[in-house]
Every structure is written in structure tokens, then in C-alpha cells.
Design a protein with these regions (language model features):
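Gly/Ser/Thr-rich loops at beta-strand to alpha-helix junctions
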Residues: 27-31, 55-56, 111-113
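Active-site-proximal loop->helix
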Residues: 62-69, 91
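Short secondary-structure transition/capping segments
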Residues: 61-65, 81-82, 119
Length: 221
């Protein structure tokens, strides 16, 4: 359906006294083309409510058991796409964003993985930077394919994934990070005072490591 046909259908239902649900595929607020639909409804003075859902990039994080913003690794998330029939401004190219080394989530790019890898590498990511392809995040048929920037195209091809997938790129997928300040006993917040010094915390960590090592040695005897 075209925009005009969609609006005509909603107008007709409104005139018939029906409640209309415009159930949108994908993420309506990301590459969803809903602004033009809302503007048309406003012109026609038809009231509506925009009901948000869980974004697929959030669903992908859950599927990956990942946090996109890890201390010491990345505190920013870039949501973007490869240029297709809808162009992307040059200043917003994947290559430009890759230079920041932030976590990247790419929509609508599953059919361009060879080109995507080249753009990411040219922008500054190494070939062995952790990456993942999440097919139909949160759906029953969800697939999680872990790979690297250099093996994106091969991984998707071997799993026969050609569309309906998100690409996640960044060191946050590696598992190495710094402990957060939020739950750090040496850190004072609005709700609690620091309970120990960094030196004391270090000694506690060393003692725990020694106890774990001794326990492991005892079990091996």
C-alpha cells in the first residue's frame, strides 16, 4: 500500500466508527516512515496515540546477553545503516562512525555485509573486532550468530541469513570491561557512602583469589 492508500483506509475506518490499529513492522521510530503518516492524520484532525514497543536493538542486546555501554570500553551507541535505495549522508557513513570505536548497531544492512565489513575496517575497526548478527530478535525463530568484523558475510551466508537481522559491532561483545562505579564499594553515591577504600578492596580481592585458589587445589587432591 502507498501512503495515500494507508491514510484512506484509516479515514474510512474512522468514519465508520471503528477503532484503528496501525500495527507497524520493525521499529516505527527507526526507518519506519511513520512521521508522514502522523502528519497526514494531524491535517485531517484525526486524533491518534503512538504506542511504543521494545526496540529490536534492545531485544538484540538481550539475545546477546550484552550491555552496549561498558565502563572503559564504550559509553556510546551508534544506530545507523548502510546506504541502499535510501541514501545516507556522507557525513553519516559507516566509515565515519567507525572512527569513534563506539558500539554500533546496524539496521537494514544484512544484504550488504561484504561492503559493511570493508567500511568498518576502513573506518578503523580491525578484522577481528567482535561482531554479531541477530536474526529476528525476540521472535521464536531468533538466531544469534557471533563472529568478527572480518567474517560477517561468511557467517550470514553459512547460516542462510539474508534479511530481518541486526548487526552489532564492538568490543563490548568481547567480555572484558572495567567494574562499574554504580556498585563499587569505594564509590560514594547520592544513596550510600563508600564502605571501603580502593586499597582495602584490592586486599579483599587478593584474599578472595587466594581462597579460591586454595579451594581449587584442595579439590584436585
Amino acid at each position: 500500500m502507498t501512503l495515500e492508500q494507508v491514510i484512506d483506509a484509516m479515514v474510512q475506518a474512522e468514519e465508520d466508527g471503528k477503532k484503528v490499529v496501525r500495527l507497524h513492522t520493525g521499529d516505527p521510530c527507526l526507518y519506519g516512515a511513520i512521521r508522514e503518516q502522523m502528519d497526514e492524520l494531524k491535517k485531517l484532525e484525526i486524533p491518534y496515540e503512538d504506542c511504543p514497543g521494545v526496540s529490536s536493538f534492545c531485544g538484540a542486546a538481550a539475545a546477546l546477553e550484552a550491555e552496549y555501554t561498558l565502563p572503559g570500553i564504550s559509553q556510546s551507541v551508534v544506530i545507523t545503516r548502510m546506504a541502499g535505495r535510501t541514501p545516507v549522508p556522507e557525513k553519516e557513513s559507516v566509515r565515519s562512525f567507525a572512527a569513534h570505536q563506539a558500539t554500533m548497531v546496524l539496521f537494514l544492512s544484512t544484504g550488504l555485509l561484504k561492503e559493511l565489513s570493508a567500511e568498518l575496517i576502513e573506518g578503523g575497526y580491525s578484522e577481528d573486532t567482535p561482531a554479531a548478527i541477530v536474526y529476528k530478535a525476540t521472535w521464536p525463530e531468533q538466531k544469534v550468530l557471533r563472529c568478527t568484523v572480518g567474517t560477517l558475510e561468511q557467517t550470514a551466508r553459512e547460516a542462510d541469513v539474508t534479511k530481518t537481522a541486526l548487526i552489532v559491532v564492538g568490543e563490548v561483545l568481547d567480555g572484558t570491561y572495567e567494574r562499574s562505579k554504580l556498585y563499587d564499594p569505594t564509590f560514594t553515591t547520592e544513596f550510600r557512602q563508600a564502605s571501603c577504600s580502593k586499597k582495602e578492596l584490592g586486599q579483599t580481592g587478593e584474599n578472595q583469589s587466594t581462597e579460591m585458589r586454595q579451594e581449587a587445589e584442595g579439590q584436585s587432591k
